[in-house]
């Protein structure tokens, strides 16, 4: 039933059925239950080629076609896909993957830091501030999305087993890459946000509506900690291969 509001983004219909569903094409495609859905530039394609992954399908958007791979990892089939940047396209592709069989998903990607955190550090978001538009189409309006305990536990157990330090954080998910104003950054920091990215709250909302497990392993890139001296650093590039390796271990552990 739709909840009407003067501001359209705050309207919500809790009916999970839509006129156009993710599997409306009726493709002959059955994906594995486990999936890595990663924001890692070309790392997914590189790794898929390296290990001889099977390309089992494609997600076709208006601007790009995304291959969907299946690999055999320690005797278990795992789906592997590169996620597009931004809450709307990332949610659309993940919803499509779920529509064709995916049930347990781990994402990874970079985040900007609002606090004094070194580059290439691993972080586990446990709460996301919903400053993007997509999540409001999947879950009723609220200020935050809470991450699922099952996913958090799997991520942290693997990090601890490998002796990799990490922090639990609240993240600020925004659509406005060029609208992170000084006053807004300060406000988010006061509220407890340690990092900023563009998809976390939206993907958590997709998972909640569809009844699947999703979690994310973030690693640090640029820094907004000093409002007078923005530092792009090296965009977390040194952690890409390590992040993918960890995600494989995490999703296998689930």
For the regions a protein language model found, what residue spans apply to each?
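Accessory terminal and edge-of-domain segments that mediate assembly/interaction
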Residues: 1-106, 112-254
């Amino acid at each position: 039933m739709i909840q009407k509001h003067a501001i359209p983004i705050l309207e919500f219909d809790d009916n999970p059925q839509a006129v156009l569903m993710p599997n409306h094409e009726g493709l002959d495609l059955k994906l594995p239950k486990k999936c890595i859905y990663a924001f890692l530039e070309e790392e997914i394609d590189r790794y898929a080629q390296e290990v001889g992954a099977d390309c089992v399908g494609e997600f076709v958007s208006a601007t790009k076609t995304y291959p969907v791979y299946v690999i055999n990892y320690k005797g278990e089939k795992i789906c592997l896909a590169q996620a597009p940047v931004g809450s709307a396209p990332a949610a659309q592709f993940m919803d499509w993957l779920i529509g064709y069989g995916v049930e347990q998903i781990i994402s990874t990607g970079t985040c900007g830091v609002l606090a004094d955190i070194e580059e290439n550090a691993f972080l586990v978001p446990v709460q996301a501030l919903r400053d993007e538009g997509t999540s409001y189409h999947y879950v009723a309006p609220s200020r935050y999305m809470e991450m699922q305990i099952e996913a958090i536990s799997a991520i942290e157990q693997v990090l601890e087993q490998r002796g990799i330090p990490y922090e639990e954080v609240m993240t600020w998910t925004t659509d406005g890459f060029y609208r992170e104003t000084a006053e807004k950054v300060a406000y988010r920091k006061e509220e407890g946000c340690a990092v900023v990215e563009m998809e976390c709250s939206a993907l958590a909302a997709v998972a909640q509506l569809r009844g699947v497990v999703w979690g994310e392993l973030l690693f640090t890139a640029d820094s907004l900690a000093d409002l007078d001296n923005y530092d792009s650093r090296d965009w977390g590039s040194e952690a890409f291969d390590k992040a993918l390796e960890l995600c494989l271990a995490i999703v296998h552990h689930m």
